[in-house]
Amino acid sequence: MKNNRSSGPEFSRKYIAHYGLRTKNLEPMVDWYKKFLDAEIQFDMGFGAFMTFDEDHHRIVIFTDDETVDKTANSAGVDHIGIGLPDFKSLVENYERLKTQGITPSLPVNHGFTTSLYYDDPDGNQVELTVDNFRTKDECREWVRGEKMAAAMKPPNFGEVFDPEDLARMFHAGASDAELSRIGIK
């Protein structure tokens, strides 16, 4: 694939405003996302809910209708939604908060340029909590464009799997961000 950015006017929005999920399991999905995102319902439609976790009016909408069918494994479409966190402290705090509510990651993986915890919602959609392993976005971009990215991005996990309990222990023992960013790397 080639990087063919338009030479015309720049795309004017620089963030994803929200995402929508269709489900057959409305209440379990709304409950899970309330816990996962520490979100609140802004508007309950009866057949769905608009929810937010920040100052915006909504970041996620979950809804159902009579025509909704179950998701199938490995179907084409969105693979996961990634939510960026500012630092390892936030990643560990969210991991521990969610664990107390019975929500644990299905895949903890160090991609080299990010450290990520992937979670499965009640419908099997993956949601990723991720933190950059470098201090600047430029350093991350340089890593992604280099040979290390090609070496790291191998199926099935596209990085090195690690135990999130090890990450939490290291964090609480005072490990630096540089040390935490190496978790799972052999």
Locations of regions flagged by a protein language model:
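Vicinal oxygen chelate
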Residues: M1-E10, Y15-T23, D70-R97, Q101-K186
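Histidine-centered active-site/metal-ligand motif
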Residues: H18, H57-I60, H80, H111
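Short N-terminal helix-initiation segments at or just after the protein's N-terminus
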Residues: Y19-V30, V61-T68, F158-E165
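Amphipathic alpha-helical segments
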Residues: K24-E40, R97-Q101
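Short alpha-helical
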Residues: E27-P28, H57, K89, T114
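Conserved short beta-strand elements that form part of the metal-binding/catalytic scaffold
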Residues: E40-S75, N94, D120, Q126-F134
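Short, glycine/acidic-rich beta->alpha junctions
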Residues: F43, K89, V109-H111
